[in-house]
Structure formats: structure tokens, C-alpha cells
Amino acid sequence: SWFFEFLTDELKLDPKKLYVTVFSGDNENKIPKDEESINIWKKLFEKKGIDAKLVDLVTVEIGSKLGMQRGRIFSYGAKHNWWSRAGPPENMPPGELGGPDSEVFYEFTNVKHDAKYGKKCHPNCGCGRFLEIGNSVFMEYKKSSDKFEKLKQRNVDFGGGLERIAAAMVDSPDVFRNDVFQSLFEDIRIRHGLNYDDAIENEKRAMRI
């Protein structure tokens, strides 16, 4: 909740442009859907006057077929909303710790969906309309020889992308368009006569490097 409040109250991001993902559960390993996160997100969006509908997508393939469906909270499987050092639950050796995560995405409404990534867009689509700007990992499980056990002591591990949040603040899908890089691009323009905004993609890539 602190991160959401930071984004909306301190940075003044439009909550209508924020979408979140949660863990849809793993029936094979008997790990339930992250209902706690769903309920928390619903309450946070409700405070902003937003009805946060839950949409179960599970996979990117399903997401590209069904699309947004007026959703605000989207559940995906372990490929997108689970973290451990070994990857998804089935790859975790006995003794390994892990847990579901919840991710926050910003929507760039000026970016049109590219159909090469699927018929319809959704938060985990690769077309660039949505950008993950932060996530919280809930370290609450330990893998035993034949099952997943709840940890007695659990914690939340947060991660956020500074450049990504800055990109959201200026509503630009290009993370290099924020103020941090402008003086560098201006120096390149003066020295080499190359303007970042007018450059072709290969030139932009060279300027970023």
C-alpha cells in the first residue's frame, strides 16, 4: 500500500493509468491464488474511486486472446507472478524459499497495441503499452521434498525501477526521455549535430549506450 500511495499521492500519477498483476495459483503444487493481495488492491483502488475488477488470465497466450475486459487486477501464473532463485515452483529444490509477487504497471495510452504480440493487449503484453514500474515479492513458502510449507516468518521484498517510474511521470514509454539524460543528449547534439528526437532507431541506440 505504501508504494501505491507513493505513486498516486506523492508523485501524482493518475491511478486510472495503473494496473496490477497477482499470482493466479498453482493447482499442481497446491499453492492457492493470492487472494490477500487481490483484496488489498481492491481497497486501494476503491479509495481512488476506481472499481478494480479482477480478470484471470493465467498465461500471456490467454491474455492476447481475451484482452483487458475492463479489468484493473490481473492474475497470471508462476511464469510472471512467482519468484525464487530457481524460478517457478517446479524448478525449486528442497529447502528453497520463494513466493508469489504482485507487479504494478503503468499504461501509456498514446502507444497503440502492436498485433504481432497477440490479437489483444494486456499488462504482460510485449507491445510497450504497459510498463512494469515496481513489484513486491512475498517470501512465504519453503519447498520441502514433496510439498510447499508456509514460513513462520515471512517478509515482503520490494523492487522498483527508478528510470521506469521517471518515464511514467513524464508519460513517455522511452525511459531515456526523462530529465536525467537530457543534458547528455544536449552535449551529443552540440558535439555531433545529432538530435535524439530526430534520430533513427540505430542512432538512438548508439546515443543511449
Report each predicted region and the residues it spans.
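Structured aminoacyl-transfer and RNA-binding surfaces used for tRNA recognition/handling
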Residues: 1-209
